[in-house]
């Protein structure tokens, strides 16, 4: 269970915004070009509500079950699913205005589009790419990305708007930013190549608490921040009885 307080969240969020502003200045970018997503994994809705009150309107979750439990408890937020999505859980996400960051295979694209068709809605998604070829991370390979984007865009109720990646962890004592930056650069190059054929592939969801500066330098349009806003994670997923 989280031990952060409301005051901690507002203070930490301010520090994150300062880091983003400094990184954008160094990259000759506007801070408005980078969307900060607060990842509330394991943290209670009370802290998510405080983040929204402090102006952090975009929130992310790794698990579908935790996402669905928190959504009705946090007014005014825009939600993102940033963790792996099982095909049988697709029906639980579609129709809730959730941006899925983890589209990684054609069968999942089919499941999302099929459910969206039933609800007569459009499901937005990002294709997750395993740019570091890390077996511990999800996502399609760089070589598979083009075909997956092409496949998904033919589905009438699915809109692919960009790419997402999670780079490999640095080695012991390594600098997260220096370790991650080549992978962020690779995703940016892939996005640029895909945009020539698929102009709607705009967004780059990359960068977390430890390496957001490197992500901004390489063109991230979305960064996923957990610990730097909400403090250390709890030992397990948040449960409704803990609110």
Protein language model features and the residues they cover:
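Conserved alpha/beta-domain cores
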Residues: 1-210, 216-218, 230-235
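Conserved acetyl-CoA-binding loop of GNAT-fold acetyltransferases
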Residues: 219-223
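Glycine/alanine-rich phosphate-binding loops at beta-alpha junctions
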Residues: 227
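Active-site loop ensemble at the mouth of alpha/beta enzyme cores that anchors a bound cofactor
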Residues: 236-243
């Amino acid at each position: 269970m989280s031990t952060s307080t409301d005051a901690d969240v507002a203070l930490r969020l301010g520090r994150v915004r300062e880091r983003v502003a400094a990184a954008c200045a160094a990259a000759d970018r506007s801070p408005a070009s980078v969307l900060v997503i607060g990842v509330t994994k394991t943290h209670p809705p009370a802290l998510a509500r405080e983040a929204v009150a402090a102006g952090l309107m975009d929130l992310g979750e790794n698990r579908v079950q935790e996402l669905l439990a928190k959504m009705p408890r946090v007014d005014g937020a825009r939600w993102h699913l940033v963790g792996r999505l099982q095909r049988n859980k697709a029906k639980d996400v579609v129709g809730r205005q959730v941006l899925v960051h983890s589209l990684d295979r054609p069968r999942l694209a089919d499941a999302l589009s099929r459910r969206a068709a039933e609800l007569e809605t459009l499901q937005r998604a990002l294709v997750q790419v395993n740019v570091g070829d890390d077996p511990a991370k999800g996502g399609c390979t760089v070589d598979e990305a083009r075909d997956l984007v092409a496949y998904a865009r033919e589905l009438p109720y699915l809109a692919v708007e960009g790419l997402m990646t999670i780079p490999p962890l640095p080695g012991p004592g390594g600098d997260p930013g220096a370790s991650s930056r080549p992978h962020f650069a690779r995703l940016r190059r892939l996005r640029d190549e895909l945009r020539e054929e698929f102009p709607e592939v705009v967004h780059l969801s990359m960068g977390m608490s430890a390496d957001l500066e490197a992500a901004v330098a390489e063109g991230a349009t979305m960064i996923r921040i957990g610990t730097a806003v909400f403090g250390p994670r709890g030992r397990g997923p948040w449960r409704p009885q803990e609110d």
